[in-house]
Structure formats: structure tokens, C-alpha cells
Amino acid sequence: MSDVTVANYHAFPDARGHFGRYGGRFVAETLIGPLQELAQAYDAARHDPDFIAAYNKDLKDYVGRPSPIYHAERLSRKVGGAQILLKREDLNHTGAHKINNTIGQALLAARMGKTRIIAETGAGQHGVASATVAARLGLECVVYMGATDIERQQINVYRMKLLGATVVPVTSGSATLKDALNEAMRDWVTHVGHTFYIIGTVAGPDPYPRMVRDFNAIVGREARAQMIEDYGRLPDAMTACVGGGSNAIGLFHAFLNDASVRIYGAEAAGDGIATGRHAASIVAGRPGVLHGNRTYVVCDDDGQILETHSVSAGLDYPGVGPEHAFLADSGRVQYVGIRDEEALAAFHLLAHTEGILAALESSHAVAHAMTLARDLPKDALVLCNLSGRGDKDVHTIAAREGVRV
């Protein structure tokens, strides 16, 4: 990691969509025009009081915001050390943080006169959230999903279909999130005249990383105000899972300039970094270009993207949002790898102590929150983003543990 001195983390990206040496637009010439059109439309919308009012109204009345911060008292006692607090994004409509972003992008699509939206999805939560807002706004919806992920997330596939979306299986490559994103990009190039591509994470070419961040930043703004109101201070540490990194940057962004708050991103270490079967782009990757932006990627010595592994479909991605790459280089956020078995243990412990089934993605963050808590005094506060609920993962966990359901 290089040494980067930053006075104000909220000053990024720059006018060209760069977070330091990361980000940008590394795309075919055919996409430059559509991306410029999208950037102009988004910049106009985010300064339009009517658009912001409509977005905030939907967050309140449709999504059900604000989401609460819950003190996991029994989990904290079981783990020992600091108090673990959960930002309950799992309580949002559709069961995850993804709806914060899809509401914003769908409203922008309608504002631009687009009649069709497309999306990629891994765990299925972004696909469900995209299908949900498409149904609400009367837009056609097509979701690209890797065939491997379809097998392990059949409940969410059926939810998308119930909502009126067409789910397109992607069989190329490893048939996971990376490949679904590739196919969605190809669709967008072909049908850009009437199609809006709702990217589900803070990756992709500019303006997507900043746009998805901005629509998810409500998580951190709420959490900051809630911490001050309920506890009279900011947390000592916070953590969130990181695949592409949208839930994490949504929580982190409001706290980046608060030097007293230690921030951690929990990547998927899969079977262990040393095995090569992981999806830890920052912990075990290197800078490269993927899906239109420069960032950290999981690749070989020649720069070729490698297949990744995680028990969690939503973290099974060989890249990470460029802002996370920048935050890693600056040292503001520390990124750690959480193995499958650690995430599964955290899933079970949270269920047994608090009656909460967390998504496998979120369980990576819960696992690291537990590690942080053990090394801190009892009066310290650790905030963990519970980015989604785990109903979708019950069959995956049961199959892994030899239970027939």
C-alpha cells in the first residue's frame, strides 16, 4: 500500500471520477457517450430539490427508513469486551441495503425517460431490489445472474420472477457475479437508447462508484446521528463486509473524517488466503482494471483475473470499488479477510444469542465485530453494519452442514 495524505475524504472523487489513482472510465468508446449522459443526468438530479424530496420520501414511506441501531447485549456478553451495535439494514423493505441504491437509480431512470432497467446480481438481493422498484415504477426489468449463483440462491430467483422480472442465467466464466456484470454491460451497450443499467455496487466506470455511494450514504448519516443521540458519542470502531463494497462505503462515508473512529472492511477469505480460494481483492490482490475502473483485483502475475470463492454469493467478486482501494492505500480503512467457517460461526452465534438471521455477507462483518470487541474494554462501542437478512442463505447453510430442508 502506498502512503497517501488526505485532508478531506469527502472531496473525492475528482472531476474525472478518480479516487487518487483509482476509478476513472476504462470502457469501450461506445460507452463513453452513455456514461457522460448518465453523469450529467445524475449531477442535475442530485442538485434538484424535487428529486431529492421524492427520493427521501420513498426511503421513509417505501423502504421504511430510518433503520435502527440495535444493541446486541447477549452477543456482547457472550463474546466479551466491547458492546456490539448492529445497524439493522436487514429490516429494510426487500431485506437488505440494496434498496437504498435501486430506489435512487430507478427514479433517475424514469427522469431520463428510460423504459427498461437491467441489473446484475450475485446473492440476488440487488436483483430483488431492482425488480421491486421496476414493478413500482412500471418499468421492464431484466436481471443477469450467474448460473452458479442461481443454484445457491433459488429463493431470490423466484422472488424476482414474482415481481415481474426476467432472470437471465449467465454460464460463462465462473458463472458468478463477475460474469453477470459482463453480460449486463453487453446488454447496455446494445440497448442504451431505452435501457438504464442499475449497477448494484460501488464499482464500474464513473459515475457509478460515486452515485451508488451517494444513494447508500443515508446509512452512515443515520448511524452518525443515532450514535450521538443514543450514546452521546461516535463508535470507537466500525466494520462492514466488503465485496464490491456498497454497504460498507454507505456506512463508512459519514465517518471518514472522524479520526477517532477506527474503520474496518471484512473481505471474503473463503477457504483461507493461502489456499487461493478466496475473494479478498484488497487483502490478497493487486491494482488492475476490471469492469471499467482501476482498483484492486484478484489476479495472477500476468494480471489475468482469477476465479474467486466465497460461501457468500454477494462477496464472490474479484474486484472492489475504487474508493475502497483508495481508502486502503491511505490507511484510513483497514481491510481483513474472514474465512467461510468464521462467517458461519458468527451466523450461528448471532442467531442463538439475538434471534437474528444475518445474511452470509453480513456474517463476515459480524465475525470481525466479535474479534474487535474481544480486544476492547467493556465500555467501548463497536458498530457493525448488518447489511441484509439471511433467509436467502438457509438452504446454502443447510446443504453445507448436511441438513436436508
Swiss-Prot record:
It catalyses: (1S,2R)-1-C-(indol-3-yl)glycerol 3-phosphate + L-serine = D-glyceraldehyde 3-phosphate + L-tryptophan + H2O. Gene3D superfamilies: 3.40.50.1100. Its EC number is 4.2.1.20. The keyword Amino-acid biosynthesis applies. Pfam families: PALP. The beta subunit is responsible for the synthesis of L-tryptophan from indole and L-serine. InterPro entries: Trp_synth_b_CS, Trp_synth_beta, Trp_synth_beta/beta-like, TrpB-like_PALP, TrpB-like_PALP_sf. It is an enzyme of class 4 (lyase). The modification N6-(pyridoxal phosphate)lysine is found at residue 98. The keyword Transport does not apply. PANTHER family: TRYPTOPHAN SYNTHASE, TRYPTOPHAN SYNTHASE-RELATED. The lineage of its organism: Bacteria, Pseudomonadati, Pseudomonadota, Gammaproteobacteria, Lysobacterales. It comes from the Bacteria. Pathway: Amino-acid biosynthesis; L-tryptophan biosynthesis; L-tryptophan from chorismate: step 5/5. GO terms for molecular function: tryptophan synthase activity. GO terms for cellular component: cytoplasm. Belongs to the TrpB family. Tetramer of two alpha and two beta chains. Its cofactor is pyridoxal 5'-phosphate. This is Tryptophan synthase beta chain. Keywords: Amino-acid biosynthesis, Aromatic amino acid biosynthesis, Lyase, Pyridoxal phosphate, Tryptophan biosynthesis.
